[in-house]
Amino acid sequence: MDEISIRSHWVSAWSTSPIDASLSETGILDRLGVAVTDVSARTAVQLTAGGTHVRLTLSNVFGVLPLHVAACTVAIGADDARGIEPDTLRTVTFGGEGHVRIAAGTSCTSDAAALPVTAGQTLTVTVFYRGINAMRTIGLIGGCSYAELGNCTRRPLLHLAIPMQHTAETGAYEVIPALTEIDVLAAPGTHACVIFGDSTVANELPRLLAARLRADGIENVSVTQAAIKGDRLVADGVGRAAKLLGGAGVKRFERDVLAQAGADMVLVKLGANDLIHPHCRSKQGLLTPVTFAQMTAGYRALADMAHAQGVRIWFCELTPWKGYTRNLFGRGDDIQWSPELDALRPELNAWFQSADCPADGYIPLDALADPDDPDALIATYTTDGVHHTPAGQRALAALIPEDIFRETPKEVHP
C-alpha cells in the first residue's frame, strides 16, 4: 500500500439517485428510455469535495441487457458544458481495461484516475457506449448531459451535441445516463453528508450547502444528493409516471445513501408525497391515506439502517404546502389543501422532536413559512406552494445548523 492510500480515503463528492427509465404502460416515459447505439454521453457535474484522484460508479441496476462501455474519460470541465480542458483529460479504466461490460442489475466502479480536483470544480465525464442497448438506468438531477454519435471521449468540444433534458408536466429533468456516483481520494477527516428526499430537495441544495460550509471554514465535508422528484417514504410511485417517481425511500435508502463512499451523515426531507398523493384526483383508487404509525415506522427503519452502519441521521421538518394544487397532465387542480388533509404533517413534525424519535437530531425549517399564514411557504420562496425557488433553496441551506458538521467524524467506510 503506497503512502497516498495510507493517508487518504475515498469520499463521495457527487451522486444522483437512479430511476428506471423503461417504458411505462401509458408511454409517459418513452422519451426517457435512452436509446444507445454507438453514442457518447458527456455529463458535467459540480464536485463538493476535492482530492488527488477520482473514480466513477456506472449503474445498470434497472437494465435487462448488459451495458457495454467501450471507452471512458474524465476531465476538468470548460465554461461550455459541452467542452473540457484538454490538458486535464484522463482515461478511465475498469479492472485495468479501457472497457467494461456491466451486467444487467449491477453497477461497476472504475479504477482510480489521477486527476487533482477541488471542491466546487466542474468534472466532466464522457462515456462511449457501443452496441444497441436500452439504457434503463438514469438519474434526473445534478448534472448537465449531452449525447453525440461515435466515440467522443477525447474530443475537446462536442459540436453536434444533443442536450439530454426532459421537460414534462411533472417537471424539468436533467437526464444523466448510468453515472450515479463520483468519488475523490480525499484528505484524512473528509466525509460525506447525503441529502435524501423528494422534489423539495431535488434541486441545488447540495451545492448551496457545500458552498456555504466552505465559506464558513468547513472544508472537510462533501454534500451529495439522493433525492427523487415525487418520491415517497413508505411506498413506490404509482400512476402514469410511476417509474419516474422512484422506489420507496425505505427500499432505496441502503443503495442510494449507505453505499456512498465516506458517508457518515444523512439529512432526510421525505414524506410530503406520502401525505399528499393519496388525496390527488389522478391517483384515486391507487392509494389509501397513510397513517401516523406507518410513517413513523418508515422513519424508524431509516434510522435503524443508518445507525447499523454508524451513520448519523437528521430528520428535517416537513414544510407547508398550502396553495399547492398539483395541476398535472392538463387536468386542472389535482388537489386542494385543507386543514384536514394537512393534519398529519404537524403531528410528524412534533414526533421528530420527541424523545420517541430515534434520529440523531431534528432540523426545524419553520422560518420558510409565511409568518401571517404558517400553513403556507413565504411567497418568494416557492414556485407553486411546495417547491422552492432559488431564494427558497438558499434559505433552506442557511437553516441547516452548522454545528452538526463541526463534530469530529467517526471512521467512515471507503
Tell me what each language-model feature is.
Residues M1-F196, V201-A202, R207, R214-E219, ...:
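N-terminal secretory targeting modules
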Residues W14, T37-T43, L58, P66, ...:
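Conserved SGNH/GDSL esterase-like catalytic core that processes O-acyl groups on lipids
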Residues T37, E174, L245-R252, T291-G298, ...:
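Soluble or luminal CAZymes and related metallo-dependent hydrolases
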Residues I276, T319-P414:
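Catalytic His-Asp segment of secreted/periplasmic serine-dependent ester chemistry enzymes
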